[in-house]
């Protein structure tokens, strides 16, 4: 049986934590930053954990993660 290919788009966006959860970046920190407060931009810079409802889909895209 052939190997399953990893979706490269998902591999570039997610990384696996030590406990097996997926880490992701937050959105809204690319442009139009002047109207956003410093506190909001600082919080957007931190990484987040993929929600449980989406974790199954991410795991399917990255079979060897």
Curated annotation (Swiss-Prot):
Keywords: Ribonucleoprotein, Ribosomal protein. InterPro entries: Ribosomal_bL35, Ribosomal_bL35-like, Ribosomal_bL35_CS, Ribosomal_bL35_sf. Residues 1-25 are annotated as: Disordered. One of its GO terms (cellular component) is cytosolic large ribosomal subunit. Residues 1-11 have a biased composition (Basic residues). Pfam families: Ribosomal_L35p (PF01632). NCBIfam families: rpmI_bact (TIGR00001). This is Large ribosomal subunit protein bL35.
């Amino acid at each position: 049986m052939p190997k399953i290919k990893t979706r490269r788009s998902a591999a570039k966006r997610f990384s696996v934590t030590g406990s097996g959860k997926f880490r992701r970046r937050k959105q809204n920190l690319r442009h139009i930053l002047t109207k956003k407060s410093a506190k909001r931009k600082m919080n957007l810079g931190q990484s987040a954990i993929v929600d449980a409802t989406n974790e199954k889909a991410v795991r399917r895209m990255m079979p060897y993660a």
